[in-house]
Amino acid sequence: YLDHTNFHKYVTDLIGIRVFFLYREDWIHFHRYIVSQFENNPEQYVVDRLNDFDENPNHYYIAELPKAYKRPGDSKIYDGSEIAIITDGIYRSLHYIVKYKGYYVEIQGRTLFEEGWSEVDHDIVYKETMDDEMLRDYSGLLNRLSGLADEMSSYFRRLKQEKENIDMHHMK
């Protein structure tokens, strides 16, 4: 059971870091950085918080399989990666639980659109009002629109890069 002597073995978000990126496809740079800084051995993923806890404060490792929370219908950008895809709910974010200096640390990565939407959703349609069918429907609609805006920013980025490539090719 949880008490003041072992809380650090149970609580995975006592320390949290949120990283923002402009374009969703930049997630791979974030992922590669995390994996390069922390040992990533699936055999060390924590199943039993109390018994699987590594007491060595100098052992820095990824403690759980990284997760990508996304909505059904979102881009398949995470498919085929070494990340668990979770599609329940309206939440969008990447989650890593790492062990650092004797504590679990939650590291999240998301786009600015995802962060902006989560703040609006949290302010207007948080858990207390999710019983309201109309608010729930509008929340779902706005979440889908936010996801489309996120996708459009990536599309425009690729379009700009293609145009620059074509312009460079014609200049030769």
Where are the regions a protein language model picked out?
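Phosphate/adenylate-binding "loop-and-lid" substructures adjacent to NTP/NAD/dNTP-binding pockets
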Residues: 1-15
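Long beta-strand-rich cores associated with HINT superfamily self-processing modules
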Residues: 8, 16, 20-158
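Intrinsically disordered, low-complexity acidic/polar and Pro/Ser/Thr-rich regulatory regions
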Residues: 159-172
